[in-house]
C-alpha cells in the first residue's frame, strides 16, 4: 500500500501561521506594523501594508476562526500613513506621495477582497441578508431618512443622495458584519474588546511619537503664549480631535476587560493611558467626555469578580496621579495653575464657533422641517473645505438641519432599540459595551463624530456585541430551568389563555393527546391561568385580551396600529407595556407571578405568549423556572411571541424561517410541528354524507359554511345578506359564535327558495359542520383555516383583522393554494353562487387542500413535549427508559 503523502513543509508552515493568527499576538504584531506604517512615511507604509495584506489573505484562506478577519477591520484604518501634515482644507491628496498612496490603496483593496471572499465562502453574506438583528429595523429607518435628506429643499442636489447612502450604509455596515461573524464563532465580545485595547495603545503610540517629533522640531507650542499647535498634530487618518475622540470611544471596551479578565491591571492602565493621551492632544471635547466615561467605568469595575485588584489599582493610580500633579506644580509654581488651565481649556476660543454652527442648523431646520436641507448644504458660517467642514458639529442639530423631522424620528426609533439592548436582562458587562456606544453619541454632541467612518466602525460593532451578549444572557437563562428529581412524577402544566379561540382550541387538542399518551407517567395540569384564581385583577386582565380581539374585529385600523406600535416600540417594550404598564390591568402582574409559582410546573406549555412572559421572569435562583414550550398557532409568528422559551413550535416551515431570520427565541429550539387539530377530526374524515343525512341535508346540496371565529364579528352577516339576495341554489350554515345579537338578526331573515339558511350561535359541533360542508367562508384565523383545509375544502377569506391574519391569508392563498381572498361580501357571494352552479370550479382548490397542506394532529406535539420531559428528568419516569448494563 502506498504511503499517505505528507503535507509539504510550505503547507505546514502556512497552517502554523494560520494557527498562530488565532492568538493575541497576531493583532499585536499587526498593530506594531500599523504603528510603523502610520509614523514613518511611504518607505514604511508601502511595504508594511503589503505585509498586512499577505497576513489577511493567509487568514482568509487557511484560518478556521472567522473572527480573526476582524483584525484588519479594527486596525488597518488607523495604520494609514502620510508623507506630510494631513490637509483637510481642500487639498487632501497632497498629504501623500502619489506612488505611496496608490500602493496603499492597492494593498487595502487586497485586504478588502480577501475579507469579502471569506465572508462569501463561509456564508456570512447570506447571514447579513437572512438573519435580522434587533436593531435592523432602526438602521433601515435611518438609511431611509438619510437617503431622503434635503428632498424638497431648494438646496437639494444629487450629491445629497450619494452622501445619504454613504452615511446610512456605513453606519449599519459594521453592525451587520460583526453580527454575522457572531453566528460562526465564539468568544467574540472579549476578542473585539482586546482588539479595541490594542488599537487604543497603537493610537497612543502614534500620538506620543508625533508629539515627541513636533517637540524636538519646536513645532509643538506657539512661542508667544505656550498654547499647543493642535493643527500640527495630524496623522494620516485624522486630526487631533478625531484621534482623541477615537481614544475616548475605546476606553469603555478596554475597561470591559478590566471587569472580566484576569489581566485587569494591564487593561486598566491602558484605559488610563488613552485618557491621558486626550489631554496631550488638548481636545476639550475628548477630555470632558473621556472623564465621564472613565469615571463611570472605574466605578463599575470597583465591583465584580476583579474588585479587589481593581480597587488596589485605582488607589495606586490615584496616588501616582496626585504625586505627579504635586511635583509638577511644585516645580512650575502653584500660582501658575490658572494660566495652565487657561491654556489647557483654550478659554480664549470658548466655543470654537460651535454656537454659530448650531444656530445655522436650527435655521435650516425651520426652513425645511420635514426632510431638512440636506447633508451637502450645511452651515453657511464655515469655509467649504470638504464634505464635513460644513456639518453643524452636533449630531442632533445635524439630524434636524440635514434630515429634518424624519431623520430625528428614525433616530429615536433606533436609539430606543439601543436602550432596550443595554437594559434588557441587564448585565454589567453589556453596560460597559454600551458605554462605548454612549461615548460616540456624547462626543458627537460637540463634533461630527457620528458621521465619521472610524467612529461608525466602533458604534456599529459595539451595538452588535451588546446584542450578542444579550443573546448569550438569554440562552444562559433558558438553560437554567429546573430539573425533575429522581422518583418524582414530572409536572406538566398546560396554561389556557383566552385571546380569541384560536389559542384555546389547539392547546386543548395537544393537552388531550398528551394526557392520553403520557398521563400515567406525568402529572398533567390544565390551568385556566387567569380565571381559576378568582382574582378580579386577573379576570379583568384576561378580559382585556378578549376586548382587544373584538376591537380588532371591528376596526382593521386598530389592528394595524397595534402591529405598527410593536414595530416602533420593539417587541420587549411592547410586551412590558401590555403586561405591566396599563393601569389598572398592571395590578394582575404580581398575582400572576405568584400563581405561576403555585403551579410549580416542571414543563410549562402554552399557546399564548402571556404565561411564557411570566415564566421568563423567573430566575435560576428562584428554583422554580420551568422548561417552557410555546406553540404559535399562526402561519407566521408576530413580535409578541418573541418571548424566550426553551422550545418554540410553529406549524409552518415559512413561519419558522421568518422567526429565525429575526433572531428570535435566543437559545431556544425552533421546530415545525403538525397543526394540532382536534382528535375527533380524524374520526370524522370520510363521513361527510353520513353527517349530512343525520342533519337532514341532501347529499347533492351545495353547503356553504360561514364563521368568523369565536366572536363572530367580521363580515359574516353582510356576506349572508348578499347570498340571500342572489337566491342561489345552496344551503347557508352561519355560525355566529358568541355574537348572540348577530345570530338573532340572521334568524329573523326569511330566505327565498331555493336558498336555505341554518343559523347557529356558539357551535360545539363545529368540526361536524365543517366536515359536512363544501366551502368555508370567514376571516383568516389560524384554526378557522386549518380545520377546513384538513377536510379538503376550498376557502374564501373575507377579512384579515390584523397583519397576523394577513400572514395566514398569504399562507393559504399563496403556499397551500386552497383559499381565495375576496374582501367584498357581494363579490364573495357571487363567487359562491357561481361555484354552486359550476362545482367543477372548486376542484383545483380541493386538490390543493388535500395534497399541499402540511401534516395534522396533536400526537407528534405531545411526543415532543414528552421527549423534553425525559431530557430534564434525572431518572427517566418510566420503566421503558431504564438503562440496561451488559457488564
Over which residues does each language-model region extend?
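Hydrophobic transmembrane alpha-helices and their immediate junctions
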Residues: 403-441
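N-terminal signal-anchor transmembrane segment
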Residues: 18-119, 148, 440
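Flexible juxtamembrane loops connecting transmembrane helices in multi-pass membrane enzymes
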Residues: 228-233, 309-315, 326-360, 380-383
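Transmembrane alpha-helices of multi-pass inner-membrane enzymes
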Residues: 252, 294, 432-443, 449-479
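Donor-nucleotide binding loops and adjacent catalytic segments primarily
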Residues: 697-772
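Long extracytoplasmic/lumenal interhelical loops at the membrane interface
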Residues: 345-403
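Aromatic-anchored transmembrane helix interface
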Residues: 100-109, 133-146, 156-180, 195, ...
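Alpha-helical transmembrane segments of multi-pass inner-membrane proteins
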Residues: 147, 170, 189-220, 236-303, ...
